[in-house]
């Protein structure tokens, strides 16, 4: 298939283009501004990229046009050409959900903060466990060298963004991913350009919760009232909670599994991973800060979930 990516320079779109190339498709694309690291990644993948949005780049017509979100509204000359010519088109998030994720055990990392870090940690844990997960991350992790990979195992880690999908699909991107393991790291008011208030964001997260199967797993902080309010709207999936001790449960929290980190260094450079009252392992690393401990704990819980039961203890 010949696939053309409009807005290929964005982190999501450039990462998707690399996945499409790895699947064996003929991939080209265009954007107004292209710069590292995505420009370097696309060049390494030998993907041809055009400057600007000249409709002539779409002649002869590709089999499919994947339309990005950033800077591609109605009125863009390439977008108007796609519509007027009746070309087959879709959004980036929908393409991922339809052509990459089916048949995979999707581990999605959502929330206001820490998505890229947590998704990178989770992917690296699976990698170190001898697996070869697919992934799509909103950055270029140091240990993984690129932002996306098809992988050869059933597991696929995706950074799940709540921002809207495209000019023609105002649902949050993560609604296309259908995760079986879902991390919600935290939840605050964000994206004031599309969400009027926190409640509107919580509604999107509740829609996401409704898409997780009963045999999956939802992983949430034990001390985030905004996340607990979303769960309280209805959740049909087992829940594991995590936190840094001492842990108090949030408003409306149920009695799901509880994982917590017991720091053994003042700067959080070392901590024990505790499930119930039993220490599962100790983490010693070069990172500092309670926020990084929280991210790591969420990743560890996800890696130990039912879908990735081959992963060893922390």
Tell me the role of every PLM-derived stretch.
Residues 1-95, 217, 225, 256, ...:
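N-terminal leader/targeting and accessory segments in enzymes
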Residues 26-31, 134-136, 241:
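Short beta-strand "acidic-cap" motif of Rossmann-like dinucleotide-binding folds
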